[in-house]
Amino acid sequence: MFGWEFPPHIAGGLGTASYGLTRGLAKHGIEVIFVVPKAYGDEDQRFVRVVNASEIETPFGDTREQDVWEKLTFIHIDSNMVPYVAPEEFDSYAEEYRRTGRTILDKEGWTERYSFSGKYGANLMEEVARYAMVAAQVARDLAGQFDLIHAHDWLTYYAGIAAKRVSGKPLVVHMHATEFDRSGEHVNPQVYDIERAGMTEADRVIAVSNLTRNSVIEKYGIPASKGVTVHNAVRFSTKDARPQERGVSDKIVTFLGRITYQKGPDYFVEAAAKVLRKTRNVRFVMAGSGDMLKHIVRRVAKLGIADRFHFTGFLKGDEVQRMFALSDVYVMPSVSEPFGISPLEAMRSNVPVIISKQSGVAEVLDYAIKVDYWDVDALADAIYGLVEYPALAEMATEKGLGEVTNLKWENAAGEVANVYRSLL
């Protein structure tokens, strides 16, 4: 199984879902080798074997991955950038490079480990391509130790393809979010091409919701017979009890997620302003980070609600649980959400939730309040109702907890196991 992140080092729902699924598969007697670009050594390996791609020796002499390499596009600067050398030494370096025709990306000489950051930085595309090269070597090193390949999201699709071509094993790709979900209609063509290539090469495509499955069929041209929906789930914990004292009497309404277009943070802010015109006994918390953060901060200031609005930055692990424990209402106003695990985590923590109708999780929840992401008035009314009418909040909390209790990773893993069996 190829992933890009694994707890406790995660940036969002992808790592959480990978963790939950691998735990669930273990309960079905399925052994999982989870390959990640960078492992830190503190991963929970009681039910999964974690392989650190940064420790894999990868000779590049084999030409079986040449087609992957040839798909890469690099912009070269016509300069040999060698630090800390005298001018005459630099001239010597430059002449040697010109004479031999060598480049920094000399694939024939790549025989050492590639140190992945495992992040989502400026060199992400290069890391995705390198990960595919390492994946091919992993498939060789582990020959005879696996029966099937499972790749999570576009970051690992090239890796899955490379491993399949080396091993001949069936490939399952897991679509957690499409490029259309992340970017609207302004898609990155490179990401789109990778997603389409992965799903085209795959023997089966798992989508996290019917919403995502339909998108895969309609926007990527993937045959309906190849796609199957397996909804995400939530892992229960003993740390989810609400505290008796919070230190504030105001109601707390929380947005937790990446502060990006996809998650609809601007709609949360506009709804907050409308609620605060009706009552001042409420505080709004935006927990997360992202490219829209500065814009959101400026908008909060312009609306004059900064004294009622709090930014926590990115939260992880126990910090997330503490935030839910402090919350009276959780809001997920996503513009396009393939699934959305965070509402399940909130309901698990006895917090009533409001979600957008444009989310996959809406397919499995009957006791969450659902609004169109763009309907700020409806969102504001829903928030106001939950903070001002205790009976409504209590009913949503009680019914929601009962509903989410049945959404277990063990059940989702059972459906994934059935997909595996259909290919073996």
Predicted regions and their residues:
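Conserved donor-binding/catalytic core segment of Leloir-type glycosyltransferases
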Residues: 206, 247-272, 285, 397
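Aromatic "clamp/platform" in nucleotide-sugar-dependent glycosyltransferases that forms part
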Residues: 335
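Carbohydrate-associated surface elements
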Residues: 211, 233
